Amino acid sequence: MSDAPLLGSAVPPDPLVCNGAALRKATRRVSQLYDTVLAPCGLKVSQHSILVHIARAGSPSMTDLARAMVLDRSALAHNLKPLQRDGYVHMMRDPLDGRSRRVELTETGRAKLAESRRLWKDAQNRFEAAYGVERAAALRHALADIFSDEFALAFSRG
């Protein structure tokens, strides 16, 4: 008997067999757990991550920030709206290229990032306590390979 799936089968494939489904499921679970820990500061882990990326880059262009976060620009713009509304980030025209926009943290945003970092560290510690420090480090390395440009290129080549 063959292990090949039956085309048109009404039974969906096991999500643990599909790499994409397994990664999405794990991402949702980890996001839920981190969001719970970050809730007292009013941020979700996705918002915390955006603030971290902006802080590291200074005042990145939208294109550079989207690339660093592996997001398309429209998704980034959508995710920036609540951060801008709450006064954590400021959008401005690039002085060297008026067609491009840059984003930077406000003072309020820097304070919110400092507050969320403490909670994020707690979430990190909880993850490593539950999953194991060495396994967590190995997981981060494996995931870094997967979200690299080199992996995307190799994948697109088939």
Regions found by a protein language model. Give the residues of each.
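N-terminal leader segment of winged-helix/HTH proteins
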Residues: M1-C41
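Short, charged, intrinsically disordered terminal tails
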Residues: P12, F151-G158
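Charged, amphipathic alpha-helical coiled-coil/dimerization segments
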Residues: S31, S59, K81-D145
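Short helix-capping/hinge SLiMs at alpha-helix to coil transitions
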Residues: P40-C41, I54-A57
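Short helix-coil-helix linker/hinge
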Residues: C41-Q47, A75, T106, Y131-V133
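Short alpha-helical "packing" element that flanks the helix-turn-helix/winged-helix DNA-binding module
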Residues: I50-L51
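The short coil/loop that forms the "turn" connecting the two helices of the helix-turn-helix
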Residues: A57-P60, L71
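The alpha-helix within a helix-turn-helix
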Residues: A66
